[in-house]
Amino acid sequence: MTDRIRALDDATVARIAAGEVVERPASVVKELVENSLDAGAASVDVSVDAGGTDRIVVADDGRGMTGDDLRMAVRQHTTSKLDDASGLDGVGTLGFRGEALYTIGSVAELTVTTRPRNAGDTGARITVDHGDAGSVAPAGHPAGTTVEVTDLFGETPARRKYLKRAATEFGHVNRAVTRYALANPDVAVSLTHDGREVFATTGTGDVQDAALAVYGREVAQSLRTVDADPAADSVERVHGYVSDPEVTRSTREYLATFVNGRAVTDAVLREAVLDGYGDQLAPDRYPFAVLFVDCEGVDANVHPRKLEVRFEDEAGVKAAVEAGVRDALLDAGLVRAGAPRGASKPGDAEISPEHSPTDRDAGAAGGGDAAGQSDGNGQRTAASGATSESPASAFETGGGDEAADSAASTDGTRERPGSGTESRTGRFDAPAENARLPTGAGGPEADDQDTTSERDSLPDLRVLGQLHDTYVVAEAGDGLVLVDQHAADERVHYERLQARVDGASQALVAPAELELTAGEAAVFEAALGGLRELGFDAELAGRTARVTAVPAVLADALDAELARDVLSSFLADADGTPVADAADAVLADLACSPAIKGNTSLAEGSVVALLDALDACENPYACPHGRPTIVEVDGDELAARFERDYPGHAGRRREDAGN
């Protein structure tokens, strides 16, 4: 580096600029497919090897180019789609900047072969090798254009090393091609990976036919029609399809939204779709959507890869999409049959009807139904004497009798924390026992604590009670501690499950069959080795995964959605250690479901048992999803909050004492 300012050479400028357009193989595929669609193609065939890192081929039967046009097409900012700046406001094509072929040729070896329609049998070919364009030569080719890309980032190793595993890169390619296939149902679109066809749409013009090809029969049959003419002046029409609330996935990637025919990943549109479902979706589940928004006042020139747009009337667009989705679901009479697996918000376990602490104590003293009461809708709710899911209630590994026995007094009545009943001896004292015991004094975990002194431990606590039946309130040596009972119990369940994962499998009585989308099926074999490390035994027949054995620790809890989420964890992984990451994600979800929920009143013994179990964890300070389990407020902060340190405070106290 020198201190002098100088102009960069053209090759360097081209490679820097290419980084804004070509980020990964999927970026190349996106640009080339857009060119094919803009050329009026009736069929577009995409083929990639090793997720596109080795080779990409996009072939179409569009208008094609002459030799002279081909020579111009690989130059910078050359296009047939835009004349001048005045056309930017009303651009009607997917591409318009004239950058695609030039930027791809700057960072890869690019070969374009083309022939215009009704132009004889001879076409033209040109090769661009990392910015070095050759001459145009005659070549035989059917009407249309074929673009081949190899050695992507071959001369920019710093860029290539940031590419992910082939399965991950193919996931991005599949997502891009899928969206164009859904957005253009009148075009026959096919995708091939490593010589194997992933999907092929028929080009009939029916979006449901396209969805059947890429998502499978289960999803296609669940799609509900959205067709609305909104009141907003800026929105002409909202149309497409959304899935039943019960047909969901654990990621947002199946929310496909299009603005004026262009695929976009706009947060406003995605949130509007989710809001249209109201409370029919759990927070961690996302529907399928193929939704088109035709509107005015859209700026598509705000993102290098045109993935985002800017709306003049953002609020009007959001309201129109939300209303369209909501009306479609209402017209279909769809209501959620039950909460999907994995709901983890404290409110999901709200007890109804609500009672005050006095009401609950009175009910307990009166010998209420300890098994729970009906809420009028066929759902059972925890009665005042129940502890819901105690810290040792599911995936039991020992100590369950003690925790269960401590949940109620001997006469069957229920005591709240703070009632003065005696609890078992340990580091976490019941309210009646004002003296705190030193670390390790008593309790079944004392011996273990000596051998695990390096792990984190909770401070000595004296339980004061529960706040809103959601947080345990306790006094620490220097301040106040709040414990989130749901997050704490999640951590306990998670570490117990983690200790039981050993790769052992358990055969299923009847094989579980799971219909996959085209993208999931395409990478199934790549993920199979990792799945077997976890204890799964499965095979793929067409689009159906047949699971014959599962990890022993999951045998009692496995369902179709959980199995699908395991696969999704492998697909989403990008750091080279998918097995451990997938296992942790699954265990975290499993730990969530049986954990004590918010708005659940706990018996005094259960609170102490929960704190003992949390203290025995390797990491007692966070749930497996990363949320804190405890919040500490020390004495200094309390004093500051009450302004006990303001100037003259001590002197005024002395004066008051003298009076």
From Swiss-Prot:
GO cellular component: mismatch repair complex
Gene Ontology biological process terms, A to Z: mismatch repair
Region span, Disordered: 338-459
MF annotations from Gene Ontology: ATP binding; ATP hydrolysis activity; ATP-dependent DNA damage sensor activity; mismatched DNA binding
UniProt cross-references to Pfam families, sorted A to Z: DNA_mis_repair (PF01119), HATPase_c_3 (PF13589), MutL_C (PF08676)
Gene3D superfamilies, A to Z: 3.30.230.10, Histidine kinase-like ATPase, C-terminal domain (3.30.565.10), MutL, C-terminal domain, dimerisation subdomain (3.30.1540.20), MutL, C-terminal domain, regulatory subdomain (3.30.1370.100)
Keyword Flavoprotein appears in the UniProt entry: no
Keywords carried by this UniProt record: DNA damage, DNA repair
InterPro entries: DNA_mismatch_repair_CS, DNA_mismatch_repair_MutL, DNA_mismatch_S5_2-like, HATPase_C_sf, MutL/Mlh/PMS, MutL/Mlh/Pms-like, MutL_C, MutL_C_dimsub
Biased composition range(s): Basic and acidic residues: 352-362
Biased composition (Polar residues): 374-391
Protein family according to the UniProt entry: Belongs to the DNA mismatch repair MutL/HexB family.
Function: This protein is involved in the repair of mismatches in DNA. It is required for dam-dependent methyl-directed DNA mismatch repair. May act as a 'molecular matchmaker', a protein that promotes the formation of a stable complex between two or more DNA-binding proteins in an ATP-dependent manner without itself being part of a final effector complex.
NCBIfam families: mutl
Protein name, entry field: DNA mismatch repair protein MutL
Organism for this UniProt entry: Halobacterium salinarum (strain ATCC 700922 / JCM 11081 / NRC-1) (Halobacterium halobium)
Gene: mutL
